[in-house]
A protein has these predicted regions:
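Small beta-barrel nucleic-acid-binding modules, primarily SNase/OB-fold domains
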Residues: 3-179
Length: 179
């Protein structure tokens, strides 16, 4: 039945007795290979995607639970591999950034990969630029993980962006010394 007020949503070539909504074409589902804790590559197109709004430890970064170091970067990679291995991903693009697509993605087991990573404490909220979309459920997921001392929040760790900056600075200094 065609309801009044829905005529604007009617497809141009559909008979007037049949309602057909105008919809955006859905992106094709992806099969991916994980690059690091927030990035993966489509195995067919080789396009690189990065989860929007979060950061995870670098693959070689560690955290410390008491006196015990643990590989928080490897854990983030393992979490993302487990969530995506042999599963189709449905991703919506937020924007392109360099040669990567910033995306929000879901699988059959995860309504929002980034939110679930935050909830499990394997990722943290990324610093957002002023014009970036803030996602309240992401902040709530991180607050929940932090309150429950899940994952990173049970440990001492350096924020991933600070760790990468320090590592890059140290690497540059090491290269200068070698010259």
């Amino acid at each position: 039945m065609l309801l009044p007020g829905n005529a604007g949503a009617q497809s141009a070539n559909a008979p007037s007795s049949i309602y057909t909504p105008k919809t955006q074409p859905q992106p094709q589902p992806l099969r991916v290979e994980v690059i690091d804790g927030t990035r993966f590559r489509d195995i067919e197109t080789r396009t690189v995607y990065r989860l929007y709004g979060i950061e995870a430890c670098a693959p070689d970064q560690t955290a410390r639970l008491g006196r015990q170091p643990w590989p928080c970067g490897a854990m983030a990679v393992a979490w993302l591999v487990t969530a995506t291995l042999n599963r189709w991903l449905a991703c919506g693009s937020v924007r392109a950034e360099g040669d990567e697509q910033l995306v929000r993605c879901a699988t059959a087991g995860h309504a929002d990969l980034a939110a679930d990573m935050l909830h499990d404490g394997v990722a943290v909220l990324a610093p957002l630029a002023p014009d970036d979309l803030k996602i309240p459920s992401y902040a709530a997921a991180q607050a929940d993980a932090r309150k429950a001392y899940r994952g990173l929040w049970s440990s001492t760790f350096e924020m991933p962006w600070d760790w990468r900056t320090r590592r890059d600075r140290q690497s540059a200094l090491d290269n200068e010394v070698r010259r």
